[in-house]
């Protein structure tokens, strides 16, 4: 890489490091809250049960655990507060990179609120479904084998602990996806306020870069048209529709015939594909889990 390229990339690398630290902080906070909810749910549940486990007791166990570790967890005050706090920080910093003047506008605050709400919903929805089969299996085993309360408590703690997200593999994707999208929305808000017409996707360019990000890197998109897509998405209230409105990429975008056999980073996305990606909300990171792409302004 030429010296100029190295020097101009340093601020981006430093910013990426700071972004990663923020994502890890959010992941750590969510892990702690999940563990607390898990332990509290077990303790509260077994305080209500008799020694002998009945069919009714099994139903209570299933309902309480699924609620505590699913919807109730995602909607808890602690989790909602953390999600909102970190999304606000990511959004604000991204906006200030392009427009340092003034504070967050009402439109910015609304975007943060919507992003926070949808992230909290899917946090509870996904994990509730993830642990549901295991809870049902363990409680049925308690009935079949005549396990007592303490024995079932031990089984649940041991088995659920095995699928609980102790590491960053699950929470890293959750926190990264939430904050990368917040940064993208914040960056577009800042560019619009600063009068910037176009932005460019910038991939990392290292050995971990995927074909999707490599192909999109260097592609230019309209700030105004992307702003219109964001506004449309923010008006969606149904969580399923919101998720579908800005889906992750499943394959690299269409490229021009003369560049299709080149390395991903050297390919050129077609004009028609740029229009399609913008319309379908697929022109902003994250393009997939743990996406590390960023946005930079295009100098006219």
Regions of interest found by a model, annotated:
Residues 166-300:
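Acidic, glycine-rich two-metal-ion catalytic cores of nucleic acid-processing enzymes
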Residues 1-165, 264-285, 296-300:
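N-terminal leader/targeting and assembly helices and adjacent pre-domain segments
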């Amino acid at each position: 890489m030429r010296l100029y390229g190295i020097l101009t990339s340093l601020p981006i690398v430093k910013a990426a490091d700071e972004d990663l630290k923020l994502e890890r902080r959010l992941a750590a906070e969510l892990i702690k809250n999940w563990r607390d909810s898990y332990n509290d749910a077990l303790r509260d549940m077994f305080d209500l049960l008799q020694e002998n486990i009945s069919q009714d007791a099994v139903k209570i166990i299933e309902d309480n655990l699924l609620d505590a570790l699913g919807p109730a967890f995602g909607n808890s005050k602690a989790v909602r507060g953390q999600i909102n706090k970190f999304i606000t920080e990511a959004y604000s910093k991204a906006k200030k990179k392009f427009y340092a003047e003034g504070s967050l506008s009402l439109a910015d605050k609304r975007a943060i609120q919507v992003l926070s709400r949808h992230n909290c919903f899917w946090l509870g929805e996904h994990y509730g479904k993830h642990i549901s089969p295991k809870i049902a299996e363990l409680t049925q085993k308690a009935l079949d084998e005549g396990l007592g309360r303490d024995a079932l408590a031990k089984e649940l703690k041991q088995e659920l602990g095995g699928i609980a997200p102790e590491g960053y593999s699950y929470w890293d994707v959750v926190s990264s996806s939430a904050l990368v999208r917040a940064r993208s929305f914040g960056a577009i808000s800042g560019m619009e306020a600063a009068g910037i017409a176009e932005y460019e996707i910038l991939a990392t360019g290292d050995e971990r870069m995927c074909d999707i990000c490599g192909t999109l890197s260097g592609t230019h998109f309209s700030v105004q048209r992307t702003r219109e897509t964001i506004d449309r998405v923010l008006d969606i209230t149904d969580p399923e529709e919101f998720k579908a409105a800005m889906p992750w990429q499943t394959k690299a975008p269409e490229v021009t015939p003369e560049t299709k056999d080149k390395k991903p980073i050297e390919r050129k996305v077609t004009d028609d594909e740029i229009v399609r990606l913008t319309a379908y909300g697929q022109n902003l990171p994250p393009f997939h889990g743990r996406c590390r792409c960023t946005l930079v302004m295009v100098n006219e």
